Curated annotation (Swiss-Prot):
This protein's record includes keyword DNA-binding: no
Membrane topology per record: Single-pass type I membrane protein
Known function: Required for normal levels of the cell wall 1,6-beta-glucan. Involved in a protein folding machinery chaperoning proteins acting in various physiological processes including cell wall synthesis and lysis of autophagic bodies.
MF-aspect GO terms: unfolded protein binding
Compartment(s) of residence: Endoplasmic reticulum membrane
Protein name: Protein rot1
Keywords in alphabetical order: Endoplasmic reticulum, Glycoprotein, Membrane, Signal, Transmembrane, Transmembrane helix
Family per record: Belongs to the ROT1 family.
Signal peptide start-end: 1-18
GO cellular component: endoplasmic reticulum membrane
Side of membrane Lumenal, spans: 19-217
UniProt-listed Pfam families: Rot1
Amino acid sequence: MVHAGYFVLGLLTTTVSAVNNVADLVGTWSTKSRNVLTGPGFYDPIQDKLLEPNLTGISYSFTADGYYEEAYYRALANPTNPECPRGIMQWQHGSYVVDSGGVLRLTPIEVDGRQLLSDPCAADKGIYTRYNQTETFNSFKVYVDSYHNVQRLDLQKFDDSFMHPMYLVYRPPQMLPTETLNPVSHSKKKRHVTRETHGWFRLTDLVKREEILNPDRWLWLGLFMTAVGGFTFIYS
């Protein structure tokens, strides 16, 4: 019985060690499709635009010195019209810490985050906004996935549910520079971006008019939708 107790304790110690090993986080991780990756292929800070991947997915990157970046591209169900799903793209970066209890806390650079919400079957515009969302993960675990035989990252959210598993794609990580990329000036600048249309669901095809809004106002996103093609007007 004593030996069994030590055996169980050893397993628990191994698990905690794996969960709390910050060095294991380092790299770029992506969900199964591996089409969504952090870095310049998802967000172009010079043109200030999000670049749509071929498939939906999630990606996180972490550095050894406490910086992170994330990229989301998701389809949102439309209960009132299942044939018209909405799409959302989100990008942000900032710093992270892991506390003594193994809790992972992500703090984004407030002015840099971006979100694009599109709905092809509703009104005449989509909304491109600043996006700022701190995140807390109760735990993380890195291990070799027995099926795919690659390193896997499991993130447990603040409500104890788990995100979709992510798999290691790059180490060192593929990321944009970790400093502020879009410092806010007192004067507003307007830019015009032309986009061609090819289909009815791809986000780049759904955007007719996009606006960078004050982050305090982005809760109104649900009131605005998207139509096909045209010019994009971005305010920063």
